[in-house]
């Protein structure tokens, strides 16, 4: 299906109770349980709810991937990525024009936990080679960047990162998802 079709039809089965054709917004904090710990698919909205589940399925289908996770904010998503992929002593390489919130997350939260952070001009082949030579766990780029809107060659960065044993994380806040 085309992205436009996926966006409006994928995972949009009529609600069995109301017959709604579009998943309604689940504006509740808790869901009924048949017994303590025995729920009907959802327990608390903070862990999942029908609205978020449908959104994740639709976005995954539009991107052509198996799974998707949505978060309440971009920084929450970034925190999850960093916490899940980087350990104390490992290096994260970012660009100099990194979004300020991401910079502060690295400096104020992850550096005190032992994660190392280096800013390098990843558009410059010599600076990129030097940064990759330091053995980073992650290369972190925004494309386009915030605030300067610099665009990186993601395919080239991914290939070089892979060759050097690093992961590439791309924040595409300003780019459309598909």
Can you annotate each of these PLM segments?
Residues 1-25:
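Short conserved active-site loop signatures built around small residues
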Residues 19, 59, 77, 92, ...:
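Buried hydrophobic positions in well-ordered alpha/beta secondary-structure cores of metabolic enzymes
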Residues 30-79, 101-108:
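Conserved N-terminal alpha-helix of the aminotransferase class I/II PLP-enzyme fold
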Residues 84-102, 120-121:
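Conserved PLP-anchoring active-site segment centered on the Schiff-base-forming lysine
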Residues 87, 132-139:
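Short acidic/histidine-rich motifs immediately flanking catalytic phosphotransfer sites
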Residues 113, 163-164:
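Helix C-cap/helix->beta junction micro-motif
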Residues 138-156, 166-178:
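Conserved PLP phosphate-binding loop immediately N-terminal to the Schiff-base lysine helix
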């Amino acid at each position: 299906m085309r992205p436009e079709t996926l966006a409006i039809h994928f995972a949009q089965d009529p609600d069995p109770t109301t017959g709604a054709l579009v998943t309604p917004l689940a504006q509740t904090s808790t869901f009924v349980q048949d017994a303590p710990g025995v729920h009907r698919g959802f327990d608390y909205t903070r862990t999942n709810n029908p609205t978020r589940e449908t959104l994740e399925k639709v976005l995954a289908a539009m991107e052509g991937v198996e799974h998707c996770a949505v978060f309440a904010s971009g920084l929450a998503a970034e925190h999850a990525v960093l916490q899940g992929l980087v350990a104390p002593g490992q290096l994260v390489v970012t660009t100099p024009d990194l979004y300020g919130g991401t910079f502060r997350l690295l400096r104020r939260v992850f550096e005190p936990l032992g994660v190392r952070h280096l800013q390098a001009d990843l558009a410059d082949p010599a600076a990129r080679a030097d940064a990759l030579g330091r053995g980073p766990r992650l290369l972190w780029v925004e494309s386009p960047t915030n605030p300067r809107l610099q665009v990186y060659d993601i395919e080239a960065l991914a290939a070089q990162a892979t060759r050097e044993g690093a992961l590439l994380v791309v924040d595409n806040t300003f780019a459309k998802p598909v």
